[in-house]
Amino acid sequence: MAEKKELKTYVHKLYEVDYEKGVIKLKNRRCPRCGSIMAHHMKPVERWHCGKCGYTEFVTKKK
């Protein structure tokens, strides 16, 4: 039989937990078009991208 693989949890990368206040907050943004979690990319241009529907927001630097 094949050996069972242990799953690596990455929930701590997606959410911030404040135990004192009892609040769980999402670190990343949600897509305004479909509501799924967006990915933050730094290269070649900083942007937020939704892998589900293809929506992209480019980050503009304010001077």
From Swiss-Prot:
A molecular-function term among this protein's GO annotations: structural constituent of ribosome
SUPFAM superfamilies found in the cross-reference section: Zn-binding ribosomal proteins (SSF57829)
Pfam family name, one: Ribosomal_S27
Binding site for Zn(2+): C31, C34, C50, C53
Cofactor stoichiometry and binding remark: Binds 1 zinc ion per subunit.
InterPro entries for this protein: Ribosomal_eS31, Ribosomal_eS31_arc, Ribosomal_zn-bd
Gene Ontology BP annotations: translation
Keyword annotations from UniProtKB, A to Z: Metal-binding, Ribonucleoprotein, Ribosomal protein, Zinc, Zinc-finger
Cofactor list: Zn(2+)
GO annotations of cellular component type: ribonucleoprotein complex; ribosome
Assembly mode: Part of the 30S ribosomal subunit.
Family designation: Belongs to the eukaryotic ribosomal protein eS31 family.
Name the UniProt record assigns to this protein: Small ribosomal subunit protein eS31
Gene (UniProt): rps27ae
